[in-house]
Amino acid sequence: DEATLLNKFLLKYYEIMPTLITGWNIDFFDIPYLYNRICHVLGESQARTLSPIKDVIWLKHRNRYRISGVSCLDYMALYKNFTYNEESSYSLEAISQKELGKGKMKYEGTLDDLMKNDIQGYIDYNMNDVDLVYEIDQKMKLMDLARGICHKGHVPYEDFLFPTRYLDGAALTYMKRLGIVAPNKPRHDEIKHVDLLGAYVKAPNPGRYKWVYDLDLTSLYPSII
């Protein structure tokens, strides 16, 4: 039954105790589905053991769960962020066909039919999905790229999507060198709403300047061509 399945999954999870998880669209399917099913079947306290410090938080502003102590790098987000062509579809089938020349395992009927009538075929279908993501990363090395950038920028792996976080990393590193312990940044749900005026925009004076850089080349490029 489902409870037995989830308990066996958790035992294997504790045995591995991953510090980094990846998969295709895991932020919006696999992780929330798994967490919510464990909550429903085994209880929330058991679901929180996905985190080594038993802290799983719903990030409303990012519409995803954060498993404290476990970095979740959604490979679909990595692919979107580090490739330059706009794809008509970002499904695993479409991207694996493009990058590997092969796709998901074919089957007749629905996935529910496959599970009920051919459990080994159902397992093979899911294992094939895992293999596709692994082979895409073996080719493109986007996990290594994201980790390298985040190590350089002194930010958590999940923050590869947010260029301004590298300013936080630089500030924290500088303060550490000065022997200053920076306060923890408040969580989004701890920040009180305050109406603020818009930022000051200074009229640019054309010229050549030192010590100027822009973190966001995506928005910078159209303004300098």
Give residue ranges: language-model regions.
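Short, well-ordered loop/turn elements at secondary-structure boundaries
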Residues: 15-21, 66-68, 72, 127, ...
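Active-site-proximal helix-loop-helix substrate-binding element of RNase H-like nuclease domains
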Residues: 31, 40, 44-130
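Anionic group-transfer/hydrolysis microenvironments
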Residues: 27, 76, 218
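Mobile, glycine- and charge-enriched loop segments
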Residues: 1-11
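Short active-site loop/helix that positions an aromatic residue
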Residues: 30-40, 218-225
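Common nucleic-acid-contacting/processivity interface regions adjacent to the catalytic cores
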Residues: 112-225
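Proline-aspartate-enriched helix->loop->beta-strand connector
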Residues: 9-33
